[in-house]
Amino acid sequence: SSVEEALIEMYLAGVSVRRVEDITEALWGSRVSPSTISELNKKAYVNIENWRKRSLTGRYPYIYVDGVYLKRNWGGEYENVSILVAVGVAEDGYREVLGAQEGMKEDKASWQSFFKWLKSRGLEGVRLVVGDKCLGMLEAVGEVFPEAKYQRCIVHFYRNVFTVTPRGKMRDVTRMLKAIHAQETREAAREKAQAVVQKLREMRLKEAAKKVEDGIEETLTYYAFPSEHWLKIRTNNMLERLNREIRRRTRVVGTFPDGESALMLVCARLRHV
């Protein structure tokens, strides 16, 4: 019924169960019990799972990956659970949420499982994986997508350098980092990076210099692809915005009773993107 659909939509939109009860009482004069809401959610879960496990067709040269952390109840204790998310760009430029899967944490085993699951559903043609540098991702990409390259998000790279940069020198360092990725060729970017590392050492920012020196190469992969794609494939901003929306929607829930309910609510939002 339309009433049932409204209740499901309220919950999936991030409205708390208590708030749903209050709304139903205000609208219809009687409160809908938590058990009724739970039963309706089970119906919604079937539809969400069908979407989550759908077959993938076509080729996706670029995929963006990230993890969003939510709180869940684990044996009476509360801990974070990571929901791994992937968005693909097809050959015609169309963007699509490829899938989401629960990962206890962002490590090699979780990423490997996630990538293999995507491949089992038909994902192919991957040439570039864009994401933040996190434990095990690079190794998982190499094992599951051996023909693909890895692009470290330059925004996350900058933020990592900023963690060891004094506030008073932040503006200068930002300008220096952006100058690297403003170059027209990878070779020119490497030369600029060397100059930036030297300048940072002269500024007595040895830790920042080391982070740039150690991590810059992973941020330059995009130069191997068409220049008209560079601005889009060198950052994970698209998925970052999506994850912020997920966090906003799930914040009202607080702690999820289990990983399954967290995954369901995340996918309910993703399938309408």
Give the positions of each predicted feature.
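RNase H-like nuclease fold core
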Residues: L27-V130, L135, E139, E143-E147, ...
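A short, charged helix-loop
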Residues: G103, D172-M176, I180, E184, ...
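Conserved beta-strand -> loop -> alpha-helix junction used to position metal-binding or nucleic-acid-contacting
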Residues: L128-L135, A140-M176
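Amphipathic alpha-helical transducer elements in NTP-driven molecular machines
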Residues: E4, V17, P34, S38, ...
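Conserved phosphate-chemistry cores used by DNA topoisomerases
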Residues: K42, G58, G93-E96, A109-K116, ...
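Acidic/histidine-rich catalytic cores and adjacent linkers
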Residues: L12, A182-V273
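Short, amphipathic alpha-helical "recognition" segments used to contact nucleic acids or chromatin
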Residues: S2-G14
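DNA-recognition alpha helix
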Residues: R18-G29
